[in-house]
């Protein structure tokens, strides 16, 4: 159940009121309640920008009926309106590709034109004009464009336009690496990620599955696992990449407040091409400085990408095609004395994207986009290496498609409607195939051979959304909603966990540990134990995610804008029905000149529960997969080194661990007495987050903008699994002996017996997280041949469980909450990111990205199950008490990446660029994973706080990439 502290009593009451309302309002009723607002609704959607302002005469009187138009220089897109009785106007939902010419005219006054007005996604530019009969007396004030202070919103974000995207070193040209210049972003490495095709990260104090991806206004999320973006976008197809870290308006939801907004390029009235060849040579890279190996492990990449766009019908229809092909070869070293060598993992990826923009008429535009993302990795996370032989390799596959169609209709000069429909297929969304399905053989300390764990999962999503924008007087209203239907599931859990062909573990003596004896020479007499999985391994889950919102950006005075919103989210997979999220923000233009803005905000945001949680309840539930295990001589023990054809008749099934869903007491009562469990929850709930911020934005000089903000984030009801059939509390002090498993089991509410259950886990919403930060961004827009972004965050994240990370068992299941309160494993007190570029003489460009971050914590464990509860996460006793959670600290993480580029003009329109990039230039030891096993004594083991091997634990050493680029 959700918990809250007394300072947040008003939140509890708000949710209680919402629950009463929700009991009496059906979905249709909810729509009817909000319907009157549909004629009062917005300014722009996430993939467009807007302009608004006031037209006055020299005496300050409003000019009624003045003509205002915006014309795109590249596409010919044109829209116009007239001012109302107060001289106010607004032109909304303007595409971002290219710049605009804004024209203002009225009979008897000199007309005024503004060239090169560049808009930002989801931002309204204020353009106020004072017209006069003499053009020299015309005055113009502009805020909210790409080069100006944002004065209409409290939203915190960092934006990269197409030029900044080009001039940022992006490792492997992966789109998700573009978040690195923002200091509020932290790497999520070490939290169970396997998606090496993308950079996984967190925003502020959230979890790695709590970031929303938005592509051209539609969802880019994968509701099945929420690991990363559903379909990657070729880098050359991006028009804008914006990270929204806080104070999001009501149109954003289903996350703890953070979002990544991607806007793709559209074609223009001229043909454009952009073709890139990239090569990462293995011979130039350094050995990772933290590696335990004495040799380099080459990581070779060849990439071809391209983009071609142009007109089909000038000023009316434009197209864009983009593609990217990757071929990566990464070696891992097999160190076992049994068969030392090198295993080459191969990674292939193909990205395709097509976009079509068509002006149906002067009031209606149509946009269609198609994406395809396909990859295969033959050695994910370098699983083969060390003592793991090539026969244990698995192929990791993913194939995703997305198609989106949107239509924008200008219903009147002040009302615009935008409708979208999207289809997303992940077929498979995740697939693990053993390279050679076979029984696994484990020779302790020597080798692991063979693999039979497999997974094949799919996800099909359909989204329909509609947003109506309406401007009336000083109000810019938005009303909208969307519905997503997701159907996912398949065979296995996310990474595969069942040895369907069995696993033999050999003895620790004799021939089993002799590297001179091949595994094929061993016999059943050398085996110490055996296990094999049986049972149901499939699951499917269908769910709806739907939402409605209303937002009013009210320009209360000429210098004060209030952002008022309300959002409702519903995820049918959970039991939460009162997810109302109010949003409030303000932006105050201090001096009225658009150069100093004070802003603040507060809002409530609900996180989505990933659909593959169902795998835990079905595959790991009472009727799911179970494992038979036996030692030599036991009932049913195999007579040869071959898997069993079926569960052995008459063999006992030892008490097993299961996971059950909240709110299903009647169903589970047929398996055990559920009333004996400790705090079985009656509902599966969505975690919710309170976000607040206050800060200032100041234009220090032309093109120099400084942002300083305090950010507070409090997440309540974090979902985590907990053993509700845990043994009694076992207090450990110095010298206290370990409790045996048998003694612990005797104290469980439901006593474990053969064919029964031991650990009975359920998802409970009792986790909490608090994040406090000061975020500073100094942005120098491009001028005088250089651009610069300095981003610094001072922060502290404390939680009682790590969101979206595996291994969430507490030290003792009877002591959670304040007993588990500690630093997040992703807590970094300081993080600095400095990025930019400088145009040098002779057509050279030099630039780079430097990131410096404090050390991350790691959890310290004893390495033994001291309380006998079946979870080997017990923390050691230090100074007469159990050490706190995540009490260890690693080493600081530094990375300096630079590039040097030279451009050659082949013809007037054709340019060739040659570029060299170096990543981790100084080969700093950036270790992610730490060995946290302290031991059970008073002094740590020799291996404590050392770095395990493998790419999951160490960032790459120094690497070089070279590019050739042809543009026209």
Describe the predicted segments one by one.
Residues 889, 926-968:
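C-terminal beta-signal and terminal closure region of outer-membrane beta-barrel proteins
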Residues 188, 529, 576, 587-764, ...:
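Solvent-exposed loop/turn elements at secondary-structure boundaries
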Residues 78, 84, 88-90, 107-266, ...:
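Periplasmic N-terminal accessory/gating domains of Gram-negative outer-membrane beta-barrel systems
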Residues 707-853:
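Gram-negative outer-membrane beta-barrel transporters
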Residues 70, 98-107:
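A short, solvent-exposed beta-strand micro-motif common in secreted/extracellular proteins
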Residues 656-666, 843-909, 913, 943-946, ...:
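Extracytoplasmic gating/loop element in the C-terminal half of outer-membrane beta-barrel translocons
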Residues 272, 297-376, 395-423, 582:
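Transmembrane beta-barrel wall of Gram-negative outer-membrane proteins
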